[in-house]
């Protein structure tokens, strides 16, 4: 029997009606009320997520920048203290090790936030490529992460923070600020397509912070949210999920995150040659949006056809709570990736008609 890992918030899930599942070796809440209710709360008011299963790795030292430039695809030299950057790590063949966030806390002090299912793999990958005077330390067990997301997130969080949150712009953060007296790193980032904040604190402070935020946010409609809504929200916003839109067999260019790949930076990073070729001449496959015209919901790995030719497969799909449509993301042969191309998806041994549509499916009005 495999023992599932738990976050520091596990003991408070039941109080809020949390229903847990095995997610990549973690026992996490898939929902508290219903996925639809939680999804709509984030789109219209605010939702609070426990994302403490995510991994955190500290990179420090004189050679920390040179090291990061070698192992990630984005240009870390453009990052200023107090800034966050979305990036990827790739294998030499261009396949993706992981996608991640980098926070620059000091001139020689970076915090990397990596996917939960990849913590061990990523840490080993980073540690095995360390250069010079750079250190890599896995601090995942010491750090908890809460995400408060939605149009009312700022107002709710402001109740327990003395600093003016309006000063924290998108993809910026403040370190060591007090949230209801608890020291935390607060960043204006998220994985929902809405405005919001991610809060990093010590593991032992997480439960108190969770309870306080739900208490002060109750009148604005703040809801505890699980992984189910997190997935439908990120999917509508077309934010990739490692293991579905990204993998060791899928490059960042194919997955549509080429903006996080800077092949013109001086450093020779892993995968640079392949990614440069794909950026300049196009990748063989492309991640596209698809809308099912007939009955049926596209799910991960369902094959996509044109006639008798299999042109790719679905990476994620659902009945969109916001758009009320059956939509999916599919990685397909680039020849067929134009919007309005008619395709078929095999759903339970039956072909159903679908069409390529623009992405993102959902974009918030600013």
Swiss-Prot record:
Domain of life: Bacteria
Keyword tags: Aminotransferase, Transferase
GO terms of biological process kind: glycine decarboxylation via glycine cleavage system
InterPro entries the UniProt entry points to: GCS_T, GCS_T_bac, GCST_C, GCV_T_N, GcvT/YgfZ/DmdA, GcvT/YgfZ_C, TrmE/GcvT_dom1
Recorded family membership: Belongs to the GcvT family.
Protein role: The glycine cleavage system catalyzes the degradation of glycine.
Cellular component per GO, a single term: glycine cleavage complex
Self-association and partners: The glycine cleavage system is composed of four proteins: P, T, L and H.
Classification via HAMAP family: GcvT (MF_00259)
GO molecular-function term, one example from the UniProt record: transaminase activity
Protein name: Aminomethyltransferase
NCBIfam families: gcvT, PRK00389.1
Enzyme Commission number(s) from the entry: 2.1.2.10
Catalytically driven reaction(s): N(6)-[(R)-S(8)-aminomethyldihydrolipoyl]-L-lysyl-[protein] + (6S)-5,6,7,8-tetrahydrofolate = N(6)-[(R)-dihydrolipoyl]-L-lysyl-[protein] + (6R)-5,10-methylene-5,6,7,8-tetrahydrofolate + NH4(+)
């Amino acid at each position: 029997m495999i023992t599932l890992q738990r976050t520091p918030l596990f003991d408070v899930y039941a109080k809020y009606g949390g229903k847990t599942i095995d997610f990549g070796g973690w026992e996490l809440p898939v929902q508290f009320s219903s996925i639809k209710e939680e999804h709509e709360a984030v789109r219209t008011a605010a939702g609070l997520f426990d994302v403490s299963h995510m991994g955190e790795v500290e990179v420090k030292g004189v050679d920390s920048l040179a090291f990061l430039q070698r192992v990630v695809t984005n240009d870390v030299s453009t990052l200023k203290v107090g800034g966050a950057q979305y990036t990827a790590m790739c294998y030499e063949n261009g396949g993706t090790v992981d996608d991640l966030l980098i926070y620059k806390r000091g001139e020689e002090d970076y915090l990397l936030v990596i996917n939960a299912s990849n913590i061990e793999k990523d840490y080993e990958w980073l540690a095995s490529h360390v250069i010079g005077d750079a250190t890599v330390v896995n601090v995942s067990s010491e750090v908890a992460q809460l995400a408060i997301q939605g149009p009312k997130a700022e107002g709710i969080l402001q109740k327990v923070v003395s600093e003016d949150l309006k000063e924290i712009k998108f993809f910026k953060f403040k370190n060591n600020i007090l949230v209801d007296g608890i020291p935390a790193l607060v960043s204006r980032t998220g994985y929902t397509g809405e405005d919001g904040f991610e809060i990093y604190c010590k593991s032992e402070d997480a439960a108190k912070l969770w309870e306080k935020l739900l208490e002060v946010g109750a009148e604005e409609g703040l809801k505890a949210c699980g992984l189910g809504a997190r997935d439908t929200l990120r999917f509508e916003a077309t934010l990739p999920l490692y293991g579905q839109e990204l993998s060791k067999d899928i490059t960042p260019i194919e997955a549509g995150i080429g903006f996080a790949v800077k092949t013109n930076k001086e450093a020779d990073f892993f995968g640079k040659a392949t990614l440069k070729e794909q950026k300049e001449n196009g990748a063989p496959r492309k991640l596209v949006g698809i809308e099912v015209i007939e009955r049926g919901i596209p799910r991960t790995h369902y094959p996509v056809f044109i006639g008798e030719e299999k042109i790719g497969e679905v990476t994620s799909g659902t009945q969109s709570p916001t758009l009320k449509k059956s939509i999916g993301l599919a990685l397909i042969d680039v020849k067929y990736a134009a919007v309005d191309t008619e395709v078929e998806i095999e759903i339970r041994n039956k072909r159903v008609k679908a069409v390529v549509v623009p992405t993102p499916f959902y974009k918030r009005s600013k």
